Amino acid sequence: MTKQLSTSPKQDGFRMPAEHEPQSAIWMAWPERTDNWRYGAKPAQATFVEVAKAIAKTTPVTMVVSAEQFENARVVLPSYIQVLEMSTDDSWMRDIGPSYVVNDHGKRRGVDWHFNALGQIGDGLYSPWDKDDAVARKVCETLGDDSYRAPIVLEGGSIHVDGEGTLYTTEECLLHPSRNPDLTREEIEDVLKVTLSIEKVIWIPQGLYNDETNGHVDNLIHVVRPGEIALTWCDDETDPQYLISRKAMDVLLTETDAKGRQIKIHKLPMPGPLYISEDEANGVDVSEGMERVPGERLAGSYANYLISNEHIIYPLLDEKHDKDVAMLLAKLYPNYEVTGVNAREILLGGGNIHCITQQIPKV
């Protein structure tokens, strides 16, 4: 029987491992919302299938699906992908799934953050969100893992860790008034240190331009390994992303990580700019949530890739850059397999490959 614990991971000797550490599984959630995923979510579902198949080359995949969509998902997903019935409000498993922590004795536990659909009523992306807020605990229950209910609102995509004491985030997101308005920056840092056993938080000012998540860090950077960061870069000084990336670089170059290392930066080219077409916008049902407007700029980023057991699964977003990014990733991760998946449908929904996946560490 699993328990929701009243202690803290730091108190119990647990830490959050980095994404490049060994994993036992990747969890995903099936896209279904017709007010976010165009044409009845069918194009997005086809893309999620391709992402799951790519991941499954090196890591088992579990896809959670509603009762209504279970048969459909089971038919279109390969038999080696586990399909599990679970209620959700949307399909951003990075944000709604548990952030796992591990100890030195082969044990793991989940961290269950409070979730409010990226800003609750008025500023959030959808309502209600109670099913999504329950997903992390359900995942832990299913896997037989104890969990901690963290005392703050946080999405998994708003943090990156290096596994050696350093956490990266953005001021834009974690200090946004729609998340934890009663907490100061220092108080949020204290919670992160106790909950994930990290020693240092590196605050990047902003996330990617026009990112509806209020600037999730996983759409701007990725931790390559301790002391090394892949950063979305824009050379066009007239583009709003230019200053955002420049400010991020300035912070990273002046900071040291928890171990005192200077941070090495690898520039990832920015795709596009990419914009939503009239056909793409018109295929989405109207609701009170996030509106899709023809001509609106999409928050496309190659940093939104997944590392899973010496395998990089990255989004194909722009033919002008896709191959160059593949070569750069192969250089950054020697001896890793690099797989690109056409990911525009995920981008149209507001995220990308990292956003729709959540790793379970191997212990």
Swiss-Prot record:
Enzyme active site: C355
Hey, what's the signal peptide range on this chain? none
Identify the InterPro entries for this entry: Agmatine_deiminase (IPR017754), Peptidyl-Arg-deiminase_porph (IPR007466)
Q: Which Pfam family, any one, appears in the UniProt record?
A: PAD_porph
Q: Could you list this entry's UniProt keywords, alphabetically sorted.
A: Hydrolase
Q: Which GO terms describe its molecular function?
A: agmatine deiminase activity; protein-arginine deiminase activity
E.C. code: 3.5.3.12
What Gene3D superfamilies has UniProt attached to this entry? L-arginine/glycine Amidinotransferase, Chain A (3.75.10.10)
The region called Disordered is annotated at: 1-20
Q: Name the reaction it catalyses.
A: agmatine + H2O = N-carbamoylputrescine + NH4(+)
Q: GO biological process: any one? A: putrescine biosynthetic process
- Feature: compositional bias, Polar residues: 1-10
The family assignment reads: Belongs to the agmatine deiminase family.
The record's listing under HAMAP family reads: Agmatine_deimin (MF_01841)
The protein here is known as: Putative agmatine deiminase
Protein source organism: Photobacterium profundum (strain SS9)
Provide the gene name from the record: aguA
